[in-house]
């Protein structure tokens, strides 16, 4: 396979994951398709990847989250800490992630961006929608 795209990603997610997990992935892929400035698709053979990116005049292309067809998500918080000098935007993203997922994302507890199992973070549709609102809000702040 040369590169992944929306349809191959969704197909692989449906084949690889339980239905409730693939439904979350599909919701997030559709959200990215509607709202991301750029979606970056991976080139791996076994596992598909998708990265939601926001175009900022001040900071260039900023990845906000990363999905895999194995049912995992990575929040690009530490990438933002290193590449977005406006600490209030990074802090806002951190606080919203902590509020959404009841996890600690400070620099000491979360020193590098890690993959999390989607089904451990999202249990109901409202949680997915709340995360989507967070991403839209951070995207808007990056574009100011």
Residue positions per predicted region:
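Charge-biased C-terminal accessory regions appended to nucleic-acid-, cytoskeletal NTPase
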Residues: 98-144
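Polyanion-binding interface signature
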Residues: 1-116
């Amino acid at each position: 396979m040369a590169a992944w795209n929306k349809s191959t990603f969704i197909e692989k997610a449906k084949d690889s994951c339980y239905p409730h997990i693939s439904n979350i992935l599909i919701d997030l892929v559709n959200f990215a398709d509607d709202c991301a400035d750029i979606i970056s698709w991976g080139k791996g053979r076994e596992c598909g990847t998708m990265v939601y990116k926001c175009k900022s005049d001040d900071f260039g292309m900023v990845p906000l989250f990363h999905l895999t067809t194995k049912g995992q998500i990575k929040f690009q918080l530490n990438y933002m800490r290193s590449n977005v000098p406006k600490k209030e935007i990074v802090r806002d993203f951190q606080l919203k992630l902590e509020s959404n997922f009841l996890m600690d994302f400070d620099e000491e507890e979360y020193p590098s961006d890690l993959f999390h199992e989607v089904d451990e973070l999202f249990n109901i549709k409202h949680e997915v929608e709340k995360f989507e609102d967070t991403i839209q809000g951070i995207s808007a702040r990056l574009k100011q």
